[in-house]
Amino acid sequence: MIRVEIYERLEAAAVAEVLELVEAGARADGLSALNEQTILNLRHGGAEAEPGAHLMIRDAEGTLVGYANLELDNDGVAAVEMLVHPTHRHNGHGEALLAALIKRATAAKCRALTIWAHGDHPTALLLADRHDFTRDRVLWQMRRHLTDADGDGEPAAGITIRSFVPGRDETRLLEVNNAAFADHPDQGGWTVRDIAMREREDWFDPEGLLLAERDVDGQVLGFHWTKVHGSGDSAIGEIYVLGVAPEAQGLKLGAALTTAGLRYLRGRGLDTVMLYVDESNVRAVRLYTGAGFTRWTTDVNYHKKL
C-alpha cells in the first residue's frame, strides 16, 4: 500500500527535496510539473498566505518520489499540481496522490477541484478520465526566432518607455497590472508581495522590465516584463507579462512595448523568444501566429465538481 503523507507546512529541508524532485522531472520531461507561482511559494514561504496542504510519497529508503500541492481559494475551489519521479511512474503513485487530494478537498467542503497537467502528458489524461475530470482550460506555449525585424511599434508622442527602478516603481507596476488583468485568473489580484518575490529570483533583471510612462505626469500606462530562462547557448527569452491599462487602450502601447521588449532580448544575445497564451483567446492567438509564433507545448487544466 502506498502511504501519502500530508503536511500543512514544509520545513526548509522538505522544500529542498520537492525542488530536487521538480528538477528531476524537468530533466526527463523538458518542462516543470509545477508552475512558477507554486515554486515561488515554496521558496519564499508564500504558502503561509494560501490555506491548503502538501502531499508527499516516499520510497522504502525515505526518498521523496511523489509530491502534490493543494491550495484553496475563497470560492471553494481547490487548485492542485502534482508530480512523480520519472523512475517511479506507472506504479500507482499518481493514483494515490490524486485519490488523497480528492479526499482532502472533499473534507474541506470544496465545491470543485482543478489540476494542471503541464505538457498534456497522456498519463495525466488517463488519470483525469478515471476520476471524471473534464478539460477546462488550455494554455499554449508559443515560440519564434528573434530577427532584426522584431516589430516596428514605437510609443506615441508624449510616452516614454524606460526600465523599472526597484524600490520606486513597485506600486505603479502593481496598479497597472491589476487594472490590465482585472478578470485574469492568474495575473490579476497581485499584491506588492507578488512583485517582491519575483524581484528576489535569480532571473530578475530590472533592465528587462519595461514601463510605458506618460511624460506629463509620470503615469505608468503599460509594461512589458521580459524574462530569460537558462544561460549560454540554451538561453531563451520570454514575453513574461505584457499589460496595458484600460484607459490607454487605442494608443498602440502593446505593439510599442512588444517591440521594445524583443529588442532588449535580442540585445542580450538571444535568438528565440517564448510566451504563454490561452487557447481560447482567439484574438491573441491570431495576433501571435501572425507575428511568427508557433505552438511549442500545451498545458491543460482539468476540472472536477465535488
From Swiss-Prot:
Any GO molecular function: mycothiol synthase activity
Binding site for acetyl-CoA 2: L242, G243, V244, N281, V282, R283, A284, V285, R286
EC number: 2.3.1.189
Domain N-acetyltransferase residues, every copy: 5-157, 159-306
An annotated GO BP: mycothiol biosynthetic process
Reaction(s) this enzyme catalyzes, per UniProt: 1D-myo-inositol 2-(L-cysteinylamino)-2-deoxy-alpha-D-glucopyranoside + acetyl-CoA = mycothiol + CoA + H(+)
Keywords: Acyltransferase, Repeat, Transferase
Keyword Acyltransferase annotated: yes
Binding-site positions, 1D-myo-inositol 2-(L-cysteinylamino)-2-deoxy-alpha-D-glucopyranoside: E36, D186, K227, E238, Y276
SUPFAM superfamilies xref list: Acyl-CoA N-acyltransferases (Nat) (SSF55729)
PROSITE patterns, per database record: GNAT
Binding site for acetyl-CoA 1: M82, L83, V84
Pfam family, one: Acetyltransf_1
Classification via HAMAP family: MshD
Function text: Catalyzes the transfer of acetyl from acetyl-CoA to desacetylmycothiol (Cys-GlcN-Ins) to form mycothiol.
Subunit structure: Monomer.
NCBIfam families, sorted: mycothiol_MshD (TIGR03448)
Similarity-based family: Belongs to the acetyltransferase family. MshD subfamily.
Protein name per the record: Mycothiol acetyltransferase
Gene (UniProt): mshD
